[in-house]
């Protein structure tokens, strides 16, 4: 007896679910206690609210930091941050993925503090095999100190996407055919730190940290990681993958951010690269 169409539909749904599960493993953090280690700064780094909230603080003696217990090789990382309020000049809140060693890979969000009323600068960078110098900087279109906002990294063999509140702000494409290394072989941990960088962070170091405002504190919540299978990622064509990650609306949002809020792009800095822009900038 032939199976019913309903039976067939159920079978295909089960097959589809199985395929999705085999190519993507979601890890929703139960708590910061389970997923992260406080690595430096003593009691300046704290986990509270039953493991649902984490804070880092900076004073004149020390900053603080944490790292993930787990390493990741391709995936989507989401974290909600509320940055240092008030006069945060001279401070840097760094949130990034990194491997270890002299040829490490790294994907950076760095939030450069500023005087009260002036906007934060979001500094992004990508290191491949120990080499960075791929900076793009942005103003944010909101006050990142008043509420929590979500900062995300999507990392696959085809490209890396930086997102703020699910709006893409930067796409770094795999340009290995042009001889540009791409992070794809070294698993990376999640790191974050709050530290003093008043020799460069605010107006090139002209504005120093006002220690009378210390301690400076940033807050974290709602961490989530979704791991992608490298095999399934590589099987997608570049164009197909691009369409899956950035639909027409997302591409418009990316252009909007880059037109109105980007304040530095290494791919436009001809003075910095008088012998010619890096190969990935010429695509």
From Swiss-Prot:
Contains at least one intrachain disulfide bond essential for its enzymatic activity. N-glycosylated; not essential for its enzymatic activity. Transmembrane segments: none annotated. InterPro entries: Beta-glucanase/XTH, Beta_glucanase, ConA-like_dom_sf, GH16, GH16_AS, XET_C, XTH. Disulfide bonds join 267-281. Xyloglucan binds at residues 110, 123-125, 133-135, 199-200, 204, 272. The record marks 108 as: Important for catalytic activity. Catalyzes xyloglucan endohydrolysis (XEH) and/or endotransglycosylation (XET). Cleaves and religates xyloglucan polymers, an essential constituent of the primary cell wall, and thereby participates in cell wall construction of growing tissues. This is Xyloglucan endotransglucosylase/hydrolase 2. It comes from Glycine max (Soybean).
């Amino acid at each position: 007896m032939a199976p019913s169409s309903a039976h067939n539909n159920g079978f295909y749904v089960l097959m589809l679910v199985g395929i999705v599960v085999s190519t993507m493993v979601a890890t929703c953090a139960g708590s910061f206690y389970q997923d992260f280690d406080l690595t430096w700064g003593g009691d300046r780094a704290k986990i509270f609210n039953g493991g649902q909230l984490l804070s880092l603080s900076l004073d004149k003696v020390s900053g603080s930091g944490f790292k993930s217990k787990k390493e990741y090789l391709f995936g989507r990382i989401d974290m909600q941050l509320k940055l240092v309020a008030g006069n945060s000049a001279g401070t840097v809140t760094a949130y990034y993925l990194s491997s270890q060693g002299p040829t490490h890979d790294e994907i950076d969000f760095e939030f450069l503090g500023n005087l009260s009323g002036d906007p934060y600068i979001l500094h992004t960078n990508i290191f491949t095999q120990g080499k960075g110098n791929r900076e793009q900087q942005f103003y944010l279109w909101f006050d990142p100190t008043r509420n929590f906002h979500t900062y995300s990294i999507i990392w696959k063999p085809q490209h890396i996407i930086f997102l703020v509140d699910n709006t893409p702000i930067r796409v770094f494409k795999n340009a290995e055919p042009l001889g540009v290394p791409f992070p794809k072989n070294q698993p990376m941990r999640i790191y974050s730190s709050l530290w003093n960088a008043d020799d460069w962070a605010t107006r090139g170091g002209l504005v120093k940290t006002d220690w009378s405002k210390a301690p400076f504190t940033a807050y974290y919540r709602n961490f989530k990681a979704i791991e992608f299978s490298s095999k399934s990622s590589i099987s997608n064509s570049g164009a197909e993958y691009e369409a899956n990650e950035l639909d027409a609306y997302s591409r418009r949002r990316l252009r909007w951010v880059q037109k109105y809020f980007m304040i530095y792009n290494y791919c436009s800095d001809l003075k910095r690269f008088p012998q010619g822009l890096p190969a990935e900038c010429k695509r």
